[in-house]
């Protein structure tokens, strides 16, 4: 079972032992960050530092001239990843016998929101989410599509994994975060993710919903939740709060917006990439979910991309809808796919295209014990994932993990 470990360039650059250490755990591939959000990261084995602070979202390579004269453009990294940090790390990892794929974080950029506040998601209360670019806005979409193509197709890379290629919402580990005081539940979080920027207001209008009335309904529906009432779970909970018709209108707008962006980004990457370049999306099989693992329709996304990376830190249940879509190989459009959508808890099916029987379904496990991971159970977790249809493993994160964690991973992979 092929396994790939996530890595940052700063884990490798300046440490002549790093690439060999990663190769020794038994992975065949690394997923190396080329565009990444702000973070504070541990480097437990690096000879020159122990903590890296990436102060803002940045590309970890030198950009080309496609960004000349454009208001929205990627930011260069500071001293945490100077110059072509990606290229330097990729060369070392390749020399160690590892296949390098890019790791590209897209619609998640707090500096972009701070410097261009009009690009951000605006909730029903008028609060902006600077970490969450609104993916409906034309200029933002153009920026994200071009960033996907440039950051994905780096010299020496054999494929890419596109993260945050969809809506972002309230859920976000912000600096000294204090947003957990009231449990909003799945439905409440959806309402708090609804955007009311001018573009989205027009989008709701095109669905027959007045944006001002919708915002008022959202605020009224959330008022009992702020006072402690449960919001309900799943899409039924959203419909209970908003009403079935308004809820459906918001979802139609948002699903189509995300779907067309994903199609455009994958098309742009394919246009820039050599033959055989693999394109995966970090994805959640519930289309109204938001965050780093974009909500998708499984059948649709597997007809667009070469596969998905599925979060399994909380269990492996999210694999089944994607495996079900692969099981529908050869069935195009809505024929035979609606049942898969029902399993996923999503509405609609792929329109055109076919799901490939060779689609990658990568189960993503956290293997850093200090971050809630369980490297000691990786062998059994991988077996469970394989039984549910996973074809590959993703391991988060080789640079952050302790020596003991890496040894547990090595032992598990040796037995697969």
Describe these PLM feature segments.
Residues 4-6, 101-154:
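Active-site-adjacent "subsite" loops/lids of carbohydrate-active enzymes
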Residues 4-12, 65-83, 128-142, 247-257, ...:
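The substrate-binding groove and active-site-proximal loops of carbohydrate-active enzymes
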Residues 229-247, 280-283, 326-333, 353-376:
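Active-site clefts of carbohydrate-active enzymes
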Residues 10-24, 139-150, 289-301, 374-384:
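Short, acidic/polar
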Residues 127-268, 278, 283-286, 291-298:
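Polysaccharide-binding and catalytic clefts of secreted carbohydrate-active enzymes
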Residues 310-318, 364-416:
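Substrate-binding cleft of secreted/luminal carbohydrate-active enzymes
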């Amino acid at each position: 079972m092929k396994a790939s470990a996530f890595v940052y360039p700063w884990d490798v650059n300046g440490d002549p032992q790093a690439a060999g250490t990663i190769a020794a755990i038994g992975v065949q591939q690394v997923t190396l960050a080329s565009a990444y959000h702000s973070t504070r990261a541990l480097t437990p084995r690096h000879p020159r530092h122990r903590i890296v602070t990436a102060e803002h979202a940045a590309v970890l390579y030198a950009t080309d001239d496609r960004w000349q004269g454009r208001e929205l453009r990627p930011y260069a990294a500071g001293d945490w990843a100077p110059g072509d940090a990606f290229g330097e790390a990729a060369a070392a990892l390749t020399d160690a016998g590892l296949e390098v794929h890019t790791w590209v974080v897209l619609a998640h950029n707090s500096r972009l929101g701070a410097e261009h506040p009009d690009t951000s998601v605006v909730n029903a209360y008028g609060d902006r989410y600077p970490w969450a670019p609104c993916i409906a806005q034309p200029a933002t979409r153009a920026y994200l599509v071009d960033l996907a193509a440039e950051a994905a197709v780096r010299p020496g890379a054999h494929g890419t994994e596109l993260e945050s290629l969809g809506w972002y919402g309230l859920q976000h580990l912000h600096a000294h975060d204090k947003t957990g005081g009231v449990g909003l539940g799945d439905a409440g979080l959806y309402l708090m993710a609804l955007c009311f920027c001018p573009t989205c207001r027009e989008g709701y209008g095109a669905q027959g919903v007045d944006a001002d009335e919708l915002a008022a309904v959202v605020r009224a529906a959330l008022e009992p939740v702020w006072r402690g009432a449960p919001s309900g779970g799943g899409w039924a909970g959203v419909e209970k709060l908003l009403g079935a018709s308004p809820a459906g209108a918001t979802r139609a707008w948002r699903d189509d917006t995300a779907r067309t962006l994903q199609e455009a980004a994958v098309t742009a990457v394919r246009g820039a990439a050599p033959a055989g370049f693999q394109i995966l999306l970090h994805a959640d099989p519930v289309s109204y979910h938001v965050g780093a693992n974009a909500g998708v329709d499984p059948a649709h996304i597997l007809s667009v991309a070469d596969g998905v990376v599925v979060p399994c830190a909380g269990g492996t249940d999210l694999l089944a809808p994607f495996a079900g879509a692969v099981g529908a190989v050869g069935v195009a459009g809505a024929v035979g796919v609606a049942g898969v959508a029902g399993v996923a808890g999503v509405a609609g099916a792929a329109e055109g295209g076919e799901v490939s029987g060779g689609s990658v379904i990568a189960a993503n496990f956290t293997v850093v014990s200090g971050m809630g991971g369980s490297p000691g159970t990786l062998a059994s977790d991988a077996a469970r994932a394989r039984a549910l249809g996973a074809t590959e493993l993703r391991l988060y994160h080789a640079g952050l993990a302790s020596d003991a964690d890496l040894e547990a991973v090595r032992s598990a992979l040796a037995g697969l």
